[in-house]
Amino acid sequence: MKHTKRIAALLLALALCFSCAACSKTVGSYRVVKTLGTEQFRIGFRDGDQAAVYVNAALKVLAADGTIHSLALKWFGTDNTTFDSDANALDALGDIPQRTFIMGLNEERFPMSYADGDVYSGFDVELAQAVCARLGWTLQYQPISNQNAYVELSSGNVDCAWGGMVLDQTDSKDSKNKKKQKMTLTAPYLENALQLIVRGDSKYRTTGSLKGTTVLLGTDETYMAALSADEKLLKHFGAAQRVTGGSKACFEALSAGECAAIVADSTALAYYTH
């Protein structure tokens, strides 16, 4: 009987170990405790703006010549982008009118787009620079929020919403909740996961082990929305603190031991672990 109980206890312990392993994943020097959700990045334009045609064509050329692949390796260590490729995409467009192109970017979405001192950087920023160089356009930047992308586009403040942007046509609904198809969107070009991350050398391996601790997240509404979607998890923490600087600031604080966990982007995790 004692032997049977001992075997049962051993099996239970093994089951718990496998359960813990299933709910967390070690990536480099970090551990992903839980994935809170996934999203897809897109580029948005005013509906009918010819800029969308030129930018899409330039992106196809940059995918064909390896520029996008090189940028993906630089920022993420791997290329999971899904841009269409066509080396001749610009040939059929004839002469391209010269212009200043204003990029509306989210400066809280490292490493897609972020403020680095007085300049902007990131995968999307460098890709936009490559696009404008190919088109002969002058590129300017304007910080916007993901939530206000449609307003910024329709008002003419920006020519595109590009830089860690998660967009769909519901973002252009009017006050009566009726769709107003006033945005032209590219196909999704990169998937991102919102993840609950701890240091790999910490004692935290499950959401349960984080009870009463402090979790940091960026000021963009995306992060709080992902955390709040799991009400039980949100209440689990002693404090949920927002910090400016997005995932970059969160990873720096986590590495410095200023918090137990962070809510951050899988693209940022890829940046810090490749």
PLM regions with names:
Residues 105-111, 117-133, 165-166, 191-251, ...:
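Bilobed "Venus flytrap"/periplasmic-binding protein-like clamshell domains
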Residues 19-22:
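C-terminal motif of bacterial Sec signal peptides marking the signal peptidase cleavage site
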Residues 27-37, 45, 94, 125, ...:
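Acidic, polar ligand-binding/catalytic clefts
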Residues 1-10:
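Bacterial N-terminal signal peptides that target proteins for export
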Residues 157, 214, 258:
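Conserved functional loop/turn residues at catalytic and ligand-binding sites
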Residues 35-81, 125-134, 200-222, 268-270:
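Extended ligand-binding regions for polar small-molecule ligands
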Residues 40, 78, 174-176, 241:
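A residue-level marker of the well-folded mature domains of exported/periplasmic proteins
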Residues 51-78, 88-89, 94-169, 240-243, ...:
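Extracytoplasmic small-molecule ligand-binding "clamshell" domains
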